[in-house]
Amino acid sequence: MVRATGSVASRRRRKRVLKQAKGFWGDRKGHFRQSRSSVMRAMAFNYMHRKDRKGDFRSLWIARLNVASRINGLSYSRLINGLKCAGIDLNRKMLSEMAIHNPMGFAEVANQAKKALEATI
């Protein structure tokens, strides 16, 4: 009886890894063993940085809000505290977009936060 080699599955697996290694430098793009380890490492970095991206964007929104709130006479932390006191439930992404694209609307929100802070003092 003929020995089964599993060549179709092996070839498919190797082609998948080599396709993912396209653009890598040197042997890493053409030799399966080196490609496999490089692709695994790349996938690990990919996973890690997808998680990091969320924090990076949050930091960007906070930096933008800090600038916009200081233009309106508040610090970032006092703006957030004032919004909570006023019961305004806007997330940092929406506030940041508002500060960029609708500065007058953001100024109104900042004034409401100021009034809420003055009411609590």
Curated annotation (Swiss-Prot):
GO terms for biological process: ribosomal large subunit assembly; translation. InterPro entries: Ribosomal_bL20 (IPR005813), RIBOSOMAL_L20_CS (IPR049946), Ribosomal_protein_bL20_C (IPR035566). GO terms for molecular function: rRNA binding; structural constituent of ribosome. Keywords: Ribonucleoprotein, Ribosomal protein, RNA-binding, rRNA-binding. The keyword Magnesium does not apply. Belongs to the bacterial ribosomal protein bL20 family. Binds directly to 23S ribosomal RNA and is necessary for the in vitro assembly process of the 50S ribosomal subunit. It is not involved in the protein synthesizing functions of that subunit. This is Large ribosomal subunit protein bL20. The gene is rplT.
